[in-house]
A protein has these predicted regions:
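Karyopherin-beta/Importin-beta family HEAT-repeat alpha-solenoid scaffold
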Residues: 1-864
Length: 864
């Protein structure tokens, strides 16, 4: 038995210690004997006598080697003969009779292609040939390998390679072939779709792709061939992926897809019918992004008829809930999507149908004497009513529905929900209440009287004993809209009853449930009502009284005997601690030094009890600094120690995130009292920000902390300046380009915020240097800085007013110091944009900044 086989067996051991030892020994062996390890693996893969698990692991290990950049240099040092040996053996193993070996080899080849394709390896050409081989296994494995190569290479593939891969897939969607081949082609194709945009831009190629998929379904429909159900499913998913990426190119071709999907709407396979409906929902998503209903508007009548028919023909299954009605749920989502993109005619038709449902003879009889109806009549009545509410839920996403319809239906819904425990379709009705809040809360929030009546009704519903916990959770979600969107002045007088209702739910029997956790959500909402209520004397008095109860609950939460599991105990503690944090951050309570210390000790007990630091704890500890340095100073050293610990665990970026926020709160509260801890803090933050895997949000928080540190530190912080300046330069380079059409919304928002934090940090550093008479340090950077901050206020960057104000102040500060030398870099057009935006703003602070820069730049304009 060879050494590498022995190591593989260790790696596959069920014993954790043996497995870890084997993995380390394998890595060491492969690092010292790189080629031998690879060649041995290849020999094992092609050896039919070797155990299957060892052969599979060999392929997996080769993939690991080629996937990690640390081995690339060793691979590049191999001779041409050695490289060819590895390639030939791997390619040969694709012909293995064993599917497991073919799959493992396919992944290894794909990983190798990432290294060798740019050097001219003809693997695409070879796989193209084998994808047309008479042996079906060759075809299938070639297609799988193509998919894996695309997965590894992504957008780095050349267009000619993409074209070759695409042709191979299309050629294998031929009804003359074995259905196992067709299945693989249609299944793997969904993963290729994101990378064929150029092909979709070409009308002929686009038509060819759509026709190839569509013809398979059409041939099945006219029964010229019985297409496997899984293939039909794959093709429908392919259409979904095509629309997810290429709605903007599909208008001329969509009529073919539409015709096919309408047939599938009413097929006898509910799963396929649901997928065909989902195709239209995906199309709506694309239209929503493009801000047009240029395709769906042409099909409103047909869609309305088809969707109504789906609801009429579904099984009379009154089982309520999100997971019980596959096609029905998909249809409801589609109605919602069609409404969101503005298909008014369809919405009107659906509202008309709802009215017909609720006013037919069966429903009139049910309204008068439901209890005396026969069982079949009751089922029919409930079925009709459920259909009406399911459709109405979808329609509610149309924001231009007549307000009278909304407010009238709201009262009927609440009336229905008061008998919730005897209503088999309660969940369907409750969701309508939620969707009214989601899309039309402005109608509830318009008048104090309407708002108060609605709030009182929701509180009454929450006071009821509701058997269906999902419905109770929906009511809590409605309460979230009241708290988050409601006028704070409107719910001031209800603050006590809202808090008491939520806490009663949080601690009621069976409220803690993993599937539907009423307890944790109630605690979350309690924190939110405290955050959002106004800081009136009466409210603060109420919250101060509640805080005493909260403190007692925290003490009780430290007793594990009060809970069924450790997880339950931890989650209740987290909820309580988060409420305390809300009280602290939003200054809804007052505390003296002794009370602050008492809260700290409870949190410390919780940390010790769990034997780990957790994010709610570090967040709350940082928030205690908001009560002022004089009160916080007694626990400062202990809290800062926890902050430093939180910044150690780079694997838990969420904990780091809260640690950075806590550090910032404490630094701002303590001023220069915490200077002694700054060097340790800087070292920790620099390690975090240099981590290549750092999340975007955490990077922004690091910049914010740097700003706070430089504003408040003494000259000793200067040793970190070169590294931070380089960080700024790198940040500018990475965020200089304006947004493009392909950039997603999250990236646009991140870059906007990131640019703002760069400017804030520049301001902080400049103030620091000015205070210590070292502002000349900026001289070597000023050219690049001015160009950057002048550029990012231009309209194509869509700058926020806060960014414009920050840039204005920064330019003013720079100009006052550097004066004439800045004339070379200043962009008058950018200054004009800044002046114009500040003049348009109604914010008093912006007016002050405007006055400042008008005075500062007066000589610049006079000399221009």
């Amino acid at each position: 038995m060879s050494l590498i086989v022995q190591l593989f067996e260790k790696c596959l051991s069920p014993n954790n210690q043996i497995r870890q030892t084997g993995e380390q020994e394998l890595f060491n062996y492969s690092a010292q004997n790189f080629y031998k390890a690879l060649s041995d693996c290849c020999s094992i893969i092609v050896n039919n006598e070797s155990p299957m698990n060892i052969r599979q692991f060999s392929g997996t290990f080769i993939k690991y080697i080629f996937s990690n950049d640390i081995y690339t240099s060793q691979w590049n040092k191999l001779s041409l003969e050695q490289i060819e040996f590895i390639k030939n053996n791997l390619m040969g193993s694709l012909a293995s009779e064993k599917q497991e070996i073919r799959q493992a080899s396919s992944l290894a080849i794909a990983a190798l292609a990432k290294i060798e394709l740019p050097k001219g390896w003809n693997v695409i050409e070879v796989l193209s040939n084998t994808s047309h081989h008479e042996n079906n296994n060759y075809r299938i494995t070639s297609l799988i390998t193509f998919k894996n190569i695309v997965d590894f290479m992504k957008s780095n593939l050349k267009q000619e390679d993409i074209n070759t891969i695409l042709c191979s897939f299309m050629d294998n969607m031929d009804l003359k072939l074995n259905q196992s081949v067709i299945y693989q082609a249609t299944y793997e194709f969904q993963y290729i779709i994101p990378y064929i945009e150029n092909n979709f831009k070409n009308e002929k190629q686009r038509e060819y792709i759509i026709d190839s998929l569509n013809n398979l379904l059409n041939m099945n429909y006219i029964q010229q061939v019985a297409l496997n159900e899984t293939i039909q499913k794959c093709i429908l998913i392919d259409f979904i992926e095509i629309l997810r990426h290429y709605t903007k190119y599909i208008q001329k071709s969509f009529n073919k897809i539409a015709e096919t999907t309408f047939r599938y709407f009413h097929c006898n396979n509910e799963g396929l019918a649901a997928l065909s409906v989902e195709i239209w929902s995906t199309l709506c998503d694309g239209e929503l992004e493009l801000k047009t209903n240029f395709i769906t508007s042409n099909y409103q009548d047909t869609l309305a008829q088809s969707l109504i028919r789906i609801f009429q023909e579904r099984e009379k299954n009154l089982l309520d809930g999100e997971d019980t009605l596959n096609l029905t749920k998909a249809s409801m989502i589609l109605i919602s999507c069609l409404a969101q993109v503005g298909n008014k005619n369809l919405v009107d038709r659906m509202l008309s149908y709802i009215s017909e449902c609720l006013n037919n003879e069966i429903m009139k009889k049910a309204d008068i004497n439901f209890q005396n109806m026969t069982k079949e009549e009751k089922i029919n009545a409930l079925f009709i009513k459920q259909n009406a509410f399911l459709i109405y839920r979808g329609v509610l996403s149309y924001e231009k529905i007549n307000s009278e319809i909304i407010m009238s239906s709201l009262q009927k819904i609440i009336l229905e929900l008061k008998n919730i425990n005897s209503l088999p379709i309660g969940e369907s009705i409750a969701y309508c209440l939620l969707y009214i809040c989601k899309y039309h809360f402005n109608l509830i929030n318009e008048e104090k009287k309407i708002f108060e009546e609605f709030l009182e009704q929701i509180l009454q519903l929450l006071e009821m004993h509701i058997e269906n916990k999902k419905i109770e959770f929906i009511f809590l979600y409605v309460m979230k809209y009241i708290i988050m969107k409601g006028n704070p002045q409107y719910f001031d007088k209800y603050l006590t009853i809202i808090i008491n209702t939520l806490m009663k739910i949080a601690y009621s029997k069976n409220s803690y449930n993993k599937d539907c956790n009423l307890a944790l959500y109630s605690l979350y909402l309690t924190g939110k009502i405290i955050e959002n209520c106004e800081n009136t004397d009466e409210n603060i008095k109420i919250i101060q009284m509640f805080f005493s109860k909260l403190y007692s609950l925290f003490q009780e939460s430290l007793n594990k005997n009060n809970f069924n599991t450790q997880e339950e105990q931890n989650n209740y503690q987290n909820g309580i601690i988060s409420i305390i944090t809300s009280c602290s951050i939003f200054k809804k309570i007052t505390m003296n030094a002794l009370q602050i210390t008492s809260v700290y000790k409870l949190i410390e007990q919780s940390i010790i009890q769990r034997n780990e630091l957790f994010q709610e704890a570090i967040c709350c500890l940082g928030s205690l600094a908001n009560f002022g340095w004089e009160l916080f100073s007694n626990i400062n050293d202990q809290v800062m120690n926890y902050v430093l610990i939180s910044l150690d665990d780079k694997r838990d970026f969420t904990l780091c995130f809260q640690g950075i926020i806590a550090a910032s709160d404490i630094i701002m509260s303590s001023g220069r009292e915490n200077i002694i801890i700054i060097p340790k803090l800087m070292d920790k933050v620099q390690k975090i920000i240099n981590d290549p895997d750092i999340p975007r949000g955490l990077k922004i928080k690091c910049f914010m902390l740097y700003t706070d540190i430089f504003i408040l530190s003494d000259s000793s912080i200067g040793e970190y300046l070169p590294d931070v300046m380089q960080l700024i330069v790198d940040g500018m380079n990475s965020s200089m380009d304006p947004p493009n059409k392909d950039m997603d919304i999250d990236t646009r928002e991140y870059l906007g915020e990131f640019r703002e934090k760069i400017c804030e940090l520049l301001t902080g550093i400049f103030l620091f240097l000015t205070e210590h008479n070292q502002a000349n340090v900026f001289s070597q950077y000023i050219d690049g800085f001015i160009k950057y901050i002048s550029k990012i206020v231009e309209p194509e960057y869509n700058p926020s007013m806060s960014l414009i104000a920050e840039v204005a102040g920064l330019l003013g500060d720079f100009y006052k110091f550097f004066k004439g030398s800045m004339n070379l870099y200043l962009n008058k057009n950018s200054l004009n944009i800044i002046f114009q935006k500040l003049e348009e703003s109604k914010d008093p602070e912006h007016k002050e900044i405007l006055l400042y820069i008008q005075q500062t730049f007066s000589d610049f304009y006079s000399n221009y």
